[in-house]
Amino acid sequence: MALKNKDISSIIKERIRNYKIEKINDEVGKVISIGDGIALVSGLKNVKNGELIIFNESVYGLTLNLEIDYIGVAILGNDTLLKEGDEAKRTFEVISIKVGPEILGRVINALGEPIDGKGEIDSEIHRQIFRVAPGVMARESVNEALSTGILAIDSMIPIGKGQRELIIGDRQTGKTAIAIDAIINQKGKNVKCIYVAIGQKNSTVAQIVRKLENHGAMEYTSVVSASASELSPMQYLAPYTGVTIAEEFMETGQDVLIVYDDLSKHAVAYRTLSLLLRRPPGREAYPGDVFYLHSQLLERAAKVNKENGGGSITALPIIETQQGDISAYIATNVISITDGQIFTKESLFNSGQRPAIDVGFSVSRVGSSAQISAMKEVTSSLKLQLAQYNEMLAFSQFGSDLDDSTKAILENGSKIYEILKQDQYSPIDQYTQVILFLAIKQNLINPIPLEYISKFKKAIIHKFNKDAKALNLKTLIRNDKKLSTKLRNEITKIIIEEIKNITKSIANYNPKDHRPIPEEYAKLVESK
């Protein structure tokens, strides 16, 4: 039946009469798809990048993609609670966390929520986790040492407060051990520490927390954990949460050490997120902005001037390599961002040289400006001595006829490497280190057989930490930060006495089988 004009006109009039003006709310949207921790949401036209979205009044998400018809949201919680058609609301807020001294001694997740069962964090201070790094004019040059307690690092690869020093190497070569030892060594030095675990096993993180507690380090340390069982968005956010906690301390004039363990897993988490958000992949399937991902994070580590708080953040990012390949994409990215790298080598680790630091490949671009004068003086030629030793070691494989100077280089080098060996969780203070390296520099270790070098090292550490006279000399180094001729001579006398005690205790020891102590130092004891 055809409609007449009159009927059409009455229908239109009826529709106009009953029409209600409804305001379209562009602050509330709908989930159009959900999966793998990513939700696509339509209807939120004015949302900002990095803004928090709330689903069903309970689950939060982070806006990462802004498309014409929909937005991509990373779910920060259990995505199984969501389904297509669920409501999504803007919060008009970006992610912020609680910061301040109350967070020390606690284990938190990437959202700043406590996961250690010790109750809520009682802090009123909140900070946004995505912030711009301090500008050039807000910074100061790095000129103060951050002692790690590790002989090889403090002598040849010195780290300064405000520096970014990469720890890079294959898996199971002691990278985390170096970082944990550095944290333990900050006890009593008024340095706050943050350990960020990205993609680690929960059991590994629990073990690290226990070790820090056993050594009294949790008093000044906070642990941020985004374990392997958590979704990619949480692993992506964890390092930014860690550095945000550190920035609060830096801006109140305090020094902070932050460890990112590790940024390889962080890059993988970001790659996963990017691929799920349908961003175009680049080299090794990483997105084009993966360099910026790490540069914006590591540039937040700095030594700032007094107008900006006067504190510092020292960063120790960790990168895992495959088969010692430091030319991989993420490895070269982070090497170019940081101020040097500590390279751990599997062959050294397996040969018993621990920490397994390859001194030849490792470098600190801050250099000796971060060392006290005494350390600078006694370690100036150490790297060269080890380079000569490694060169001669390769050369000596081809022939047994070696001259005396080559034998001396090989013997001295092997003794230095023996002194550089160090057990985990046993950091040595930098003033005791100065004394050990003085013994090397002055060739006082000549008469000691290689197998007794570790005994000599223990004797010196014990002597200069227990004996009143020796302890007084160490205090003078701490106060003056340099070695006067008189102080050097007094320390040399004590070292020679300890060497004599060791050689006397060796059965069938023949001094003629070993090079003597240089005459100028031997005289000091004889003339006493």
Curated annotation (Swiss-Prot):
Keywords: ATP synthesis, ATP-binding, Cell membrane, CF(1), Hydrogen ion transport, Ion transport, Membrane, Nucleotide-binding, Translocase, Transport. GO terms for cellular component: plasma membrane; proton-transporting ATP synthase complex. One of its GO terms (molecular function) is ATP binding. The keyword rRNA-binding does not apply. It is an enzyme of class 7 (translocase). The record marks S362 as: Required for activity. ATP binds at G169, D170, R171, Q172, T173, G174, K175, T176. Its EC number is 7.1.2.2. Signal peptide: none annotated. Belongs to the ATPase alpha/beta chains family. F-type ATPases have 2 components, CF(1) - the catalytic core - and CF(0) - the membrane proton channel. CF(1) has five subunits: alpha(3), beta(3), gamma(1), delta(1), epsilon(1). CF(0) has three main subunits: a(1), b(2) and c(9-12). The alpha and beta chains form an alternating ring which encloses part of the gamma chain. CF(1) is attached to CF(0) by a central stalk formed by the gamma and epsilon chains, while a peripheral stalk is formed by the delta and b chains. It comes from the Bacteria. It is a peripheral membrane protein. The keyword Transport applies. HAMAP family: ATP_synth_alpha_bact (MF_01346). Produces ATP from ADP in the presence of a proton gradient across the membrane. The alpha chain is a regulatory subunit. It holds the Pfam family ATP-synt_ab_N. It is found in: Cell membrane. This is ATP synthase subunit alpha 1.
